[in-house]
Swiss-Prot record:
Protein's job: Catalyzes the reversible interconversion of serine and glycine with tetrahydrofolate (THF) serving as the one-carbon carrier. This reaction serves as the major source of one-carbon groups required for the biosynthesis of purines, thymidylate, methionine, and other important biomolecules. Also exhibits THF-independent aldolase activity toward beta-hydroxyamino acids, producing glycine and aldehydes, via a retro-aldol mechanism.
GO biological process: glycine biosynthetic process from serine; tetrahydrofolate interconversion
NCBIfam families referenced in this protein's UniProt entry, alphabetically: PRK00011.1
Subunit: Homodimer.
Modified residues (N6-(pyridoxal phosphate)lysine): 226
Protein name (record): Serine hydroxymethyltransferase
Length: 407
């Protein structure tokens, strides 16, 4: 931590408090991770001082010679990482990436089809409380009651009935692989654009552990944190440069002004790290840890939605244990284990309560946790949920966390 912050005592204490929480706890929120020191250095660099409206070679401000090269480097690395012909690294977030893509491909009132939030989708895939549900007519698809897997027959039936302009494949709480080929065939059948939101599994795609949507999607959006382990931000990719030009105009000047070039530098670092061989091994362990942790909890009587996972996350149905997601989140938080309450498919409880929790392994894997340690993590989770919080259990969690240093 920067020592000069000590002059601002109130803020220094709060940052120190959060650093202590991260260092002494087990971070199991699927959308969180720990960036490298190199990413933090880039994000905290002098690039934060520079305004750079526009794109490399076409700025509205002078003095962008180095900035242009930084952003161009990030673009080229993103393209190489995912095999894309075009990339935009300026979105401030995944939500803004989705907004720009929708605005480039649709007009207000057009039909957007995406995964229902209650089935594992994201707010930006058509939730009525989100811009996507306010600007567009929304049709939502879900999962089968028997398997809890995406119902492709329903997807096709809804697409044929409603003729959406855009079909979104992607989710924030779906633990299985996506059949992008089948989605593209459905999109082509109804004349829709296929947009894949790979925010959660982008790092796994980069490592070759999840199907790559680029050969099938018209446009791919993502965040740059989560499994990609970069700074918080957004990314848009496509193999259609003409579509890319339309999206460029929607990012700037459409919905954003000056890009955050210090964050873009952090993205460039993360893309470089993800291009290294060791990132593949890291990602392999993320998936293996998720599988082993899900199996260990299942052996303790917890119902795992879909019966397991293919990626970095899984959902736990707590109804057999007589707990709500809210209760579980609070009990685990009290001993230093961080998860989030999450709806399960066909959940009878409201979103602020839920019947389940979502668990992910990117962050603990970054700290060096191995598959062999997942039964112990499952034991700690089980004890916190069934016995309730205690100082003794909190100390066990703390010791385990401190044995695995943060980057």
């Amino acid at each position: 931590m920067v020592s000069t912050l000590k002059r601002d005592e109130a803020l220094f204490e709060l940052i120190a408090l959060e650093e202590k929480r991260q260092r002494e706890g087990l971070e199991l929120i699927a959308s969180e991770n720990f960036v490298s020191k190199q990413v933090r250095e880039a994000v905290g660099s002098v690039l934060t001082n520079k305004y750079a409206e526009g794109y490399p070679g076409a700025r509205y401000y002078g003095g962008c010679e180095a900035i242009d090269r930084v952003e161009s480097l990030a673009i080229e690395r993103a393209k190489a990482l995912f095999g894309a012909a075009w990339a935009n690294v300026q979105p401030h977030s995944g939500s803004q990436a989705n907004m720009a893509v929708y605005m480039a491909l649709m007009e207000p009132g057009d039909t957007l089809m995406g995964m229902d939030l209650a089935a594992g989708g994201h707010l930006t895939h058509g939730s009525r409380v989100n811009f996507s549900g306010k600007l567009y007519k929304v049709v939502s698809y879900g999962v089968r009651p028997d398997t809890e897997l995406i119902d492709l027959e329903e997807v096709r039936r809804l697409a044929l009935e409603h003729r959406p302009k855009v079909i979104v494949a992607g989710a924030s709480a779906y633990p299985r692989f996506w059949d992008f080929k089948a989605f593209r065939e459905i999109a082509d059948e109804v004349g829709a654009y296929l947009v894949v939101d790979m925010a959660h599994f982008a790092g796994l795609v980069a490592a070759g552990l999840h199907p790559n949507p680029l050969p099938y999607a018209h446009v791919v959006t993502s965040t740059t944190h989560k499994t990609l382990r970069g700074p918080r931000g957004g990314l848009i990719l496509s193999n259609d440069p003409e579509l890319g030009k339309r999206i460029d105009k929607l990012i700037f000047p459409g919905i954003q002004g000056g890009p955050l070039e210090h964050v873009i530098a952090g993205k460039a670092v993360a893309f470089f790290e993800a291009l290294q061989p060791e990132f593949k091994e890291y990602s392999r362990l993320v998936v293996e840890n998720a599988k082993r942790l899900a199996e260990a909890l299942a052996r303790r009587g917890y119902r795992i939605v879909t019966g397991g996972t293919d990626n970095h996350l899984f959902l736990v149905d707590l109804r057999p244990k007589g707990l709500t997601g809210k209760e579980a989140e609070e009990r685990l938080d009290a001993v230093g284990i961080t998860v989030n309450k999450n709806a399960i498919p066909f959940d009878p409880k409201p979103p602020r309560v839920t019947s389940g929790i979502r668990i992910g392994t990117p962050a603990i894997t970054t700290r060096g946790f191995t598959p062999e340690e997942m039964p112990l993590v499952a034991e700690l989770i089980d004890r916190a949920l069934l016995e309730g919080p205690s100082e003794a259990l909190r100390e066990e969690v703390r010791r385990l966390a401190l044995a695995h240093p943060m980057p």
